[in-house]
Amino acid sequence: MAATDNAAEQVAHIAEKIRAGKTTLGIEFGSTRIKAVLIDDNFQTIASGDYSWASHLEDGLWSYTTEEIWGGLQSAYAPMANDVETAYGEKLTHVGHIGFSAMMHGYLAFDEAGELLVPFRTWQNTNTSEAHKKLSELFQYNIPERWSIAHLYQAVLNKEEHVSKVAYFTTLAGYVHWKLTGKKVLGVGDASGMFPIDPTTHTYETAFIEKFDALPEVAAQPWKLENLLPEPLVAGTPAGELTEEGAKLLDPSGALKPGIVLAPPEGDAGTGMVATNSVRVRTGNVSAGTSIFAMVVLEHKLKALHPEVDLVTTPAGDLAGMSHANNFTSDLNAWVGLFGQFAKAIGQPVDAGMLYGTLFRAAIADDVDANCGGLLNYPFRSGEFLAGLPEGRPLFARSPEANMTLGNFMRAQLFSAFSPVKIGMDVMTKQERVQVDSLVGHGGIFATPKVAQKILAAAFNTPIKVMSTAAEGGAWGMAVLANYLWNTNEDHSNLADFLDGCVFKDAQSTTEKPVASDVVGFEDFFARFTKGLPIEHAAIETINLEDK
């Protein structure tokens, strides 16, 4: 009876918080899922909703339609709001603050009337190699292929008809925020994936803007770059209010009222840093999903230009080095799905948790070979700059004498998933001697205890911490950033202290240290992985991208 009373009291307590607006909502657009998370003022998730989606090829480029964006947003919000009403008896009419986050980079370009000029070009597209090379050389600063400025400049170089009409361009998070508030702003972390940010002023690098505008093909355009970019805002800055039109876009039922103050819209790198408490200098995180990035907050700028390392900022505006790989779980999920089909075919269907857990644990069983027994896998569904691949073809290969076991197979899947991101991380830690006090892993792959954590420790030869919030991901991190609007000081300089002292003060974590034999095994696998990349090039030449 006491337990029932306590549960009822807890529900009543949370219902009161919902009525009082002591909640914040974070919504993140990932590559395969849009997730909405509502948290209370103790940073606990009290309701959530999600919607699955996938990019598609449009004229040879990866894209999502605006109908998919808005339909997906509403389809993630609705079950969260329903969750609130079902669990706590409250119709969700208001929340304290809202924040939107999304996969970074890409290209959403609009004319003066606010009309989309070309289909959304996502970060997955690697058709911007010429722009990447020319801008990196011009700035002496790495401009990756997926950055928004590379997409704009490539369109200029291609003499695309829409370029002269561009009045504004932004990221996915910036687009959603703009349509819901009317404000053309962007969190500084997301902005740093559009165009380089000065970590001192937290604005765009003016010298680079001047160099860009001076390029003859750019000077011929009717616009100046600074007039096209969203305004960067550091975490804790109010970023506009939900308009009446915006409220209806988010919640077509009309229950949600306008006037809610929004946080600056951020990128998935920034929300990953927040979700892992990795915004302080010499800390880092590995955010793993459809793509993967490893990030370290830097003490100072890197000594040299490294194409393998992106320089972005934390949501507070501090410089961070990032190794980003386009490909991570897509190929892995396809193989796991195949095993799931087999289980169903023999009349023994298993749920996703058991399926992934069983297969993942096989990868670290006592009888596996540390180097995967001669098995080799390439997880490239799309192009991969780090590996020099313009397109992707998932591949599995082995020598005739390889030790083909389930454990070795799954180990090869996981090793290969972490291999592309290792390329850039090795540049930072081995060439630039970047010091890392801690690395925290987050994302759904870490939900199975120890497995991905242990393999990542071997890949980077460094201890990997996973926190109790590991599977919360970016939507929760965005909700925390929205909560920070209540806690910030005037100069917004204490995000790291806020996370340490408020959000993560009681957080539980586990740490896996690298095992010497695993490190040696990974390095052996990685050497074969690198040596075998010509196999991937041959596949690109001989297998059509859209073959079915």
Q: What kind of region is each of these model predictions?
A:
Residues 6-19, 25-26, 133-186, 195-219, ...:
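Active-site core segments that coordinate phosphate-bearing ligands/cofactors
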Residues 47, 57-58, 106, 113-119, ...:
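Glycine-rich, flexible loop/turn motifs
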Residues 85-122, 144, 177-189, 193-198, ...:
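Short beta-strand-loop/turn "lid" adjacent to the catalytic site in phosphate-handling enzymes
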Residues 125:
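Carbohydrate-associated surface elements
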Residues 223:
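ATP-dependent phospho-/nucleotidyl transfer catalytic cores
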